[in-house]
Amino acid sequence: MEAGSRNCHDALARIGLDPALTLRALARRQGGAGSAAVEAFIRERFAARYGARVRHFMPTLLQLEDDAGVRHGAVGVRSAARESLFLERYLDRPVETEIARTSGFSPARERIVEVGNLAAKGAGHARLLIVALTSLLVAQGFDWVVFTGTPEVLNSFSRLDLGTLPLGEADPARMGDELADWGSYYDSHPMVMAGNIRLGHERLVSLGVYRQLAHQPLYAVTERQDFAVA
């Protein structure tokens, strides 16, 4: 059984109806069996889908688990405030410059967060992760999310009616010696994408998506979480 950690203090939200799932955070810098198990889940999903060997993980991982502790999805986050982002290897300029070029906005770097390591048992679980994460990142004070999206991932955003902006192609030539680890991943021609988190959040509210998915945040709307800024 793919069981997650059951520490009640890391529970961030409840979402879903059948079954109801809990979003939990695990800071990798703290180590422990919980983060190792989530890393293993991500590795297994990428290996099964692309024949890839995932070696890089975000500083903080989040997971969706049911009440029996069975893991249904996972994702990683990294703030742009203190370090370069994984996906910036694909860009010719800093991510905030590329967002400004594409969107017309001028975001502060510390208000940008990278999402990656997305792995789920099914497309429905991926959408639950996206919805729960949108609410959480708004509460953290982030304005823009950036990610490398395959057609499958982009379809999840489209199904949720969340707009995204292309920043450029995720060129496999930028991976250097690491390219051999990624199997068939780049065959799908992934793109570097950006999304305005607050506009996305407002869209989910107006469409009633949070209500339909029984989303229940376990943090105050104005409460800034610390885990994603490491």
Would you name each region that the model predicts?
Residues 210-230:
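Short, cationic low-complexity segments
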Residues 168-215:
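Accessory, usually C-terminal, subdomains that scaffold auxiliary metal cofactors
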Residues 1-33, 213-214:
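Conserved N-terminal entry element of GNAT/NAT acetyltransferase domains
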Residues 88-177, 190:
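Acyl-donor binding region in acyl/amide transferases
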Residues 66, 119-122, 197:
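Short, flexible loop/turn elements at secondary-structure junctions
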Residues 26-110, 199-200, 228-230:
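A conserved beta-strand-loop-helix scaffold within acyl/acetyltransferase catalytic domains
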Residues 74-76, 159, 207:
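Structured alpha-helical
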Residues 118, 187, 222-223:
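Intrinsically disordered, low-complexity linear regions
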